[in-house]
Curated annotation (Swiss-Prot):
Protein known as: Kelch-like protein 38
UniProt KW Transferase keyword: no
Gene that this sequence comes from: KLHL38
Signal peptide start-end: none
Keywords: Kelch repeat, Repeat
Length: 581
């Protein structure tokens, strides 16, 4: 476009420069006014010094400085083959270059040497488009040779996000120890720790004598606390190769204490192991299952909520309708225990246990409880599940407790609670299981804290006027146990160390039969029933979040439907390996 000014018109011919370049290329092809030939092997291409000097700093320095090439008729370019030289000259005179699988590497190397940054980046972009799990490790090495940060970043991203496929490639076995350490130790590695361990052992055994000395340092990159204890027990703890290393033996013993000891871990190394964060690829998902939906009968629905997308997703339905079952998460699986199995015309108190795998999106039967029960409470600690109280087959209030060992797949009876209660708030903190409040068989509130010492299998109780919750969940939030509502708007935070309660910001409504869980250090409360100002009871679809940092509540919108007496859980997994978006 022409530009007018006070003293005239500025004319711009936008085709002039491209036409000029086209004419110069025509002169080159006709060998008119050419004054230098650049050579690769026996291949000689006549060119114009001024065009070459204008095209890159490399040629400008060659022809405009005191180098001998300034006056030579022929200039030999070492390290460049004839086809690549043709591509470079074509690019200089036309601004175009054909990049393909068979020439991208020599063209990229030549572009780097001759200082053509845009051509170099074009080659990098082409290689990035060809990245796959099978070649990304090789591309990382290539990018380091070529000093190409954009390619290196993209190739590493593929290597991290496609770890299971990369681990199966031959290139992994060819990494040096330092490269493997940086790879396996990266927070962004998208893979389960079991696969990380397996990849490490494959690498070591590929050249055992030369690589055995790196085993201790590399074994530290496996985040053992996120490995399924059964896998650790069967495949890691007694591995002969690891046991041959005294340093690895210490790591193994530390991990064993952390995973399997019911006593508190006070060893400094064990504390360090305990506090290594999960990899960034792990995400927390909120799970809602069972309960009563839209004032109707008990539902089999299972819903997953992603905080990242704000979307709800339906999962495989519960195998049967269960009224007032309990549910927990353990080792990235969901366990649903007991409940009253509701079918057409019949209702039976169940001792069944159903286990859900998010990766398979499937339910399976687990080892049944010793006693059939519903309206009970369950909680998990380390490798154990505790199932507490409830109502038995004879509709009697039970004070019994049983414990499931997920490694040995067995249930055993434990000490009964001092006072049998229904619908208490339950949480585990610092090797102790806490039962807050609840109600007796006559539906009178029980103002007690009942505490179970896990390693001693013993109970004690404390009376308190602070407790009056019924049908309220409890969660561990930081160093405190938070009791959420229970026929009240009140939120109480209990500090086990000081045995004191702190009142937090109230909920909007008086709520009961709701669910609560923790994701990312925040409390999420779902559904339930609420008491209106005129003392009517309404089912709720509310979805609220409490931030302990600011002591404030915010609405997260609505659940897909009204729901109460449901389970509300947090399940941690890697979306890519679990079929999630």
């Amino acid at each position: 476009m022409d530009e007018e000014s006070l003293d005239g018109l500025l004319f711009k011919d936008h085709d002039f420069s491209s036409d000029l370049l086209r004419q110069l290329n025509s002169l080159r092809q006709s060998r008119i006014l050419t004054d230098v030939s650049i050579c690769a092997g026996a291949r000689e291409i006549p060119c114009h010094r001024n065009v070459l000097a204008s095209s890159s700093p490399y040629f400008r320095a060659m022809f405009c400085s005191s180098f001998r090439e300034k006056s030579e008729a022929k200039v030999q370019l070492k390290g460049i083959d004839p086809p690549t030289l043709d591509q470079i000259v074509s690019y200089v005179y036309t601004g175009e270059a054909h990049i393909a699988t068979d020439n991208v590497l020599p063209v990229m190397e030549a572009a780097s040497m001759l200082q053509f940054p845009k051509l170099f980046e074009a080659c990098s972009s082409y290689l990035q488009s060809q990245l796959a799990p099978s070649n990304c490790l090789g591309m990382i090495r290539l990018s380091e040779i070529l000093s190409c940060e954009t390619l290196k970043k993209k190739a590493r991203e593929v290597a991290l996000t496609s770890f299971p496929e990369v681990a199966a490639s031959a290139d992994l076995k060819e990494l040096c120890a330092l490269e493997l350490r940086d790879y396996l130790g990266d927070d962004g590695l998208c893979g389960e720790e079991e696969k990380v361990f397996e990849a490490l052992m494959v690498w070591i055994k590929h050249d055992l004598q030369a690589r055995k000395r790196y085993m201790q340092e590399l074994f530290k990159q496996v985040r053992l606390q996120y490995i399924h204890p059964a896998f650790f027990h069967h495949f890691i703890a007694n591995d002969a190769l690891l046991q041959s290393s005294p340093a690895c033996q210490i790591i193994l013993e530390t991990a064993k204490r952390q995973m399997f000891s019911l006593c508190g871990t006070t060893v400094p190394d064990c504390k360090l192991l305990l506090h290594v964060p999960p990899r960034n690829s792990y995400q927390d998902f909120l799970i809602l299952l069972g309960g009563r939906k839209d004032s109707q009968q008990t539902t089999r629905d299972v819903l997953l909520y992603s905080k990242q997308t704000g979307q709800w997703q339906s999962l495989a339905k519960l195998p049967t309708r269960l009224y007032k079952a309990s549910a927990i998460t353990l080792h990235r699986s969901i366990y649903v225990l007991g409940g009253m199995a509701v079918s057409s015309g019949r209702s039976l108190v169940s001792h069944n246990v159903y286990i859900f795998s998010l990766k398979l999106n499937q339910w399976r039967l687990g080892e049944p409880m010793l006693v059939a029960r519903y309206s009970h409470r369950s909680t998990a600690h380390k490798n154990f599940i505790f199932s507490i109280g409830g109502i038995g087959e004879g509709q009697e209030l039970m004070g019994s407790m049983e414990r499931y060992d997920s490694i040995c797949n067995v249930w055993e009876s434990m000490a009964s609670m001092p006072v049998g209660v229904l619908h208490p708030a339950v949480a585990v903190k610092d090797q102790r299981l806490y039962l807050f409040g609840g109600e007796d068989i006559m539906q009178n509130p029980v103002r007690l804290i009942q505490v179970y010492h896990i390693s001693r299998n013993s109970w004690f109780k404390m009376e308190t006027r602070m407790i009056k919750n019924v049908c309220a969940p409890a969660v561990v939030l930081g160093e405190r146990i938070v009791i959420v509502g229970g026929y009240t708007r009140r939120i109480l935070a209990y500090d086990p160390q000081s045995n004191k309660f702190v009142k937090c910001a109230d909920m909007k409504d008086r709520r009961m039969h709701h669910g609560a869980t923790v994701m990312g250090n925040k409390l999420y409360v779902t559904g339930g029933r609420r008491l209106t100002t005129d003392c009517n009871i309404e089912d709720s679809a509310s979805f609220d979040c409490y931030d302990p940092e600011t002591d404030t509540w915010t609405s997260q919108g609505q659940l897909p439907h009204k729901l109460f007496d449901h389970a509300c859980l947090t399940l941690q997994c890697i979306p890519r390996t679990s079929g999630l978006p």
